[in-house]
Every structure is written in structure tokens, then in C-alpha cells.
Design a protein with these regions (language model features):
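Short flexible loop/turn segments that cap and initiate beta-strands
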Residues: 148-152
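Extended lipid/amphipathic-ligand handling interfaces
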Residues: 1-3, 9-14, 19-41, 62-80, ...
């Protein structure tokens, strides 16, 4: 039935350019509060520079580049009002990993982003950017920042941020929201 999907899959292939697969299953799709679902995806993208021509003729088109090879993999899930996702993008020896979760019943959420030797210059070669190493964690509960019960925290550590051949890493940010009060600390 439309409400239950036992198994679904997708395969996209263009020799020399794209190899992408995804599969998943779901129950109670039409009721987000009861939905249970899981999905996985994996892609290998090569020699995709031809896509740059599809961008509007603008300053962005002249500044952006698509690396020769990009790998993408991840998962997503839903469990009766709780949603999660995890994804990793790899290229030119670097990686971005993203994980997140949201529980709509308890209004709890969290996200983690990691960049390990991620080559920003592979995407924006004209912007004097280099490698990026950082870790970001954020989480909390409650959606209204003015309510005293809402809590949140952010932790950011930038170990390396290259710009014009210099490293501007070594920056840390910690911020907390609790009891209607926001506090934070920035250090280098």
C-alpha cells in the first residue's frame, strides 16, 4: 500500500561519471508520528565538470569548480517522530561528515559536523581558500529560545582554516542557552 513500502531501490549509472544507489523501506508513511523508515545511499561521481555549464552565466559559475571525483554515502531514518540522518562527502583526500537527529515529540535535536582536511579550494579555486579541519557539535531541547525550559549548546573547534597560504586555525567557540540566558566563550 501507499502507507507501507516494503523495499524501494534506485540505481543510477552513467559510465565514467555516475554510480549511485539508494534503497530503503518504510511503514506508516502517511503518518509522521507513527512512521518507521530507513534508507541508505552511496554515490561515486567522476569527471562532473560538465555540470558547471548548467549553472547560470554568473559570477558564481566563473568561481565554482567540481572536483574530478566525489564520493557520497549516508543513511536516514525515522522512528515514530524521531528522525536521523548521517552523510559523508569525500573528495581530493578530504572529507565532510554530517550527523543529525530530531525528536519532534520531545523537541530534542542534535547535529555534528566534521571536516577533515576538506579541500575548499577544490570547489572555490579563485577564493584563496585551502584545507579546513573543524568539529561542530550543537544540540538542545525546545524550539522557543524565549522559554526558560529551552536548552541548547554549541561547540566549535577550528583546527585548520587555510586562507591565502596562512592557517587561521586554533579557534574555539562554546555557547550555551539555559534558563533564558545565553553565555559563551571564544578563544584562540
Amino acid at each position: 500500500t501507499l502507507g507501507d513500502i516494503g523495499k524501494a531501490g534506485l540505481d543510477i549509472s552513467s559510465p565514467g561519471h555516475v554510480a549511485f544507489t539508494a534503497d530503503g523501506a518504510a511503514r506508516n508513511v502517511l503518518d509522521p508520528g507513527r512512521m518507521e523508515a530507513s534508507a541508505r545511499f552511496e554515490g561515486d561521481f567522476r569527471d562532473m565538470a560538465f555540470l558547471e555549464a548548467l549553472l547560470p552565466d554568473s559570477a558564481l559559475r566563473r568561481r565554482i569548480a567540481i572536483p574530478d571525483r566525489i564520493r557520497l554515502r549516508g543513511t536516514a531514518g525515522a522512528d515514530k517522530g524521531a528522525f536521523s540522518a548521517a552523510s559523508t562527502l569525500s573528495t581530493d583526500g578530504g572529507e565532510i561528515a554530517l550527523q543529525g537527529r530530531l525528536d519532534t515529540r520531545s523537541e530534542a535535536y542534535g547535529i555534528e559536523l566534521r571536516c577533515d582536511s576538506f579541500p575548499l579550494n577544490s570547489f572555490l579555486p579563485a577564493d584563496s581558500l585551502g584545507l579546513l579541519d573543524l568539529a561542530l557539535q550543537a544540540g538542545g531541547s525546545g524550539f522557543d529560545p524565549l522559554r526558560a525550559q529551552t536548552r541548547g549548546n554549541i561547540r566549535l573547534q577550528v583546527d585548520r582554516a587555510e586562507f591565502r597560504g596562512r592557517d587561521f586555525g586554533g579557534v574555539k567557540l562554546n555557547a550555551n542557552l539555559e534558563g533564558g540566558q545565553l553565555s559563551g566563550r571564544l578563544s584562540d
